[in-house]
Curated annotation (Swiss-Prot):
PROSITE patterns linked to this entry: RIBOSOMAL_L33 (PS00582)
Coiled coil: none
InterPro entries: Ribosomal_bL33, Ribosomal_bL33_CS, Ribosomal_bL33_sf, Ribosomal_zn-bd
Record has Acetylation as a keyword: no
Alphabetized Gene3D superfamilies for the sequence: Ribosomal protein L33
GO terms for biological process, alphabetical: translation
NCBIfam families for this protein: PRK00595.1 (NF001860), rpmG_bact (TIGR01023)
Protein name: Large ribosomal subunit protein bL33
Organism: Rhodopseudomonas palustris (strain BisB5)
Keywords: Ribonucleoprotein, Ribosomal protein
Gene Ontology molecular function: any one: structural constituent of ribosome
Entry GO terms, CC: cytosolic large ribosomal subunit
Keyword NAD among record annotations: no
Family recorded in the similarity comment: Belongs to the bacterial ribosomal protein bL33 family.
Length: 55
């Protein structure tokens, strides 16, 4: 069996609220860590989310 191209990652809020999104990314085309600006409902504003591994 071949190795999967897409992997699941966790986007953790930089506002230190503990909130995170789970998404997937293509590991071949996006080799660097993903960062996105998304809504954090705990902080009730848009903040930067950084990639972390799912344990």
């Amino acid at each position: 069996m071949a190795k999967a191209v897409t992997i699941k990652i966790k986007l953790v809020s930089t506002a230190d609220t503990g909130f995170y999104y789970v998404t997937k990314k293509n590991s071949r085309t996006m080799t660097d860590k993903m960062t996105k600006k998304k809504y954090d409902p705990v902080a009730r504003k848009h903040v930067e989310f950084k990639e972390a591994k799912i344990k």
